[in-house]
């Protein structure tokens, strides 16, 4: 893991969290229980504090950063998709931020909300619970249904299970030169399907 103290402030990582070795944690970063931090994620706590609460995940290539005296927080069971950028914002409990979305300074995403992939949430946005936010700039397009939340929670459960699986079974290796006969397929632990299927 690439974990760095900055001016004497050392990142805090709960022993049940999983941090991919290519992720970078700098300075004032606090990682909670059962958190998954994916490959190439960058959590740069050199100005503001970065907090990822229990059961949340920050997937491949995500960036967290913030201004001085402004915390950037992913609350419990938050789900942050590949390539998202979080800057001095708060992601509410059990919410999902879609792939390559950007959440700007002072924005608050309400609990149990979903930010659609590729959305841009403006600075100072004040969201409410159970909103579907979409677009650039992101707008409330509809309310979140119980079915939406079931799908979101299954996806988050996959990452919570992946945290344990990676801690137990992710091993650096050298590649094979050809696929072996009867090559096994890796699978998730739930029956979650992509939207639309």
Curated annotation (Swiss-Prot):
This is Carnitine operon protein CaiE. GO terms for molecular function: transferase activity. It comes from the Bacteria. Belongs to the transferase hexapeptide repeat family. One of its GO terms (biological process) is carnitine metabolic process. It comes from Proteus sp. (strain LE138). Keywords: Repeat, Transferase. CDD domains: LbH_paaY_like. Residues 188-197 have a biased composition (Basic and acidic residues). InterPro entries: CaiE (IPR023446), Hexapep (IPR001451), Transf_Hexapept/Carb_Anhydrase (IPR050484), Trimer_LpxA-like_sf (IPR011004). Gene3D superfamilies: Hexapeptide repeat proteins. HAMAP family: CaiE (MF_01525). Pathway: Amine and polyamine metabolism; carnitine metabolism. Overproduction of CaiE stimulates the activity of CaiB and CaiD. Residues 177-197 are annotated as: Disordered.
